[in-house]
Amino acid sequence: MEHYLSLLVRSIFIENMALSFFLGMCTFLAVSKKVKTSFGLGVAVIVVLTIAIPVNNLVYNLLLKDGAIVDGVDLTFLNFITFIGVIAALVQILEMILDRFFPPLYNALGIFLPLITVNCAIFGGVSFMVQRDYNFVESIVYGFGSGVGWMLAIVALAGIREKMKYSDVPPGLRGLGITFITVGLMALGFMSFSGVQL
């Protein structure tokens, strides 16, 4: 149990997808203007990561890994295309559910919801799962923790950006300029967790 708790804390704070690895920056910067929208996208990313990483773990271990189907048959060259296909299917299902049951959130996310398919945070989480050879339960914990960490970062950035709307920002830094500086300072804050050993 302690191992899983350590993995969860590491994936949220120490190895934060957005602020340690800088993955998923396109949607991270574009959707972080309002806390409500950021929270909705963060929940969507949590759901996709929590499902995509374990499902891809099963696909990798049962089909693609060297010797998984037949001894001597290595299908790992199909990793990327298979993982992207699984992620795309999950995002499509999530998009249909949001459209049906949560139309305001679906409309607020707009084009960024289908972009979760190619969000490098999702694919990065799946790639880290394979690289670190997580088992099925570890991949569930890692997927959930990575999603929570990404959501924590985007909601924090959205809160800061909402407050900065009323600040006296120098004209040359307005818009994305001050946002990049803010993200850099947030990343420095999360870097302080890097020395923590669990």
Swiss-Prot record:
Q: Which GO terms describe its cellular component?
A: Gram-negative-bacterium-type cell wall; plasma membrane
Report the EC number(s), separated by commas if there are several: 7.2.1.1
Name the enzyme's class.
translocase
- Which GO BP terms apply? respiratory electron transport chain; sodium ion transport
Query: Has keyword Magnesium?
Result: no
Q: Kindly give the membrane topology term recorded for this protein.
A: Multi-pass membrane protein
Q: Where are the transmembrane segments?
A: 11-31, 39-59, 77-97, 110-130, 140-160, 176-196
Family of this protein: Belongs to the NqrDE/RnfAE family.
Q: PANTHER family annotated for this entry?
A: INTEGRAL MEMBRANE PROTEIN OF SOXR-REDUCING COMPLEX, NA(+)-TRANSLOCATING NADH-QUINONE REDUCTASE SUBUNIT E
What this chain does, per the record?
A: NQR complex catalyzes the reduction of ubiquinone-1 to ubiquinol by two successive reactions, coupled with the transport of Na(+) ions from the cytoplasm to the periplasm. NqrA to NqrE are probably involved in the second step, the conversion of ubisemiquinone to ubiquinol.
- What this protein is called in its record is Na(+)-translocating NADH-quinone reductase subunit E
What organism is recorded for this protein? Answer: Photobacterium profundum (strain SS9)
- What would be the name of the gene that encodes this protein? nqrE
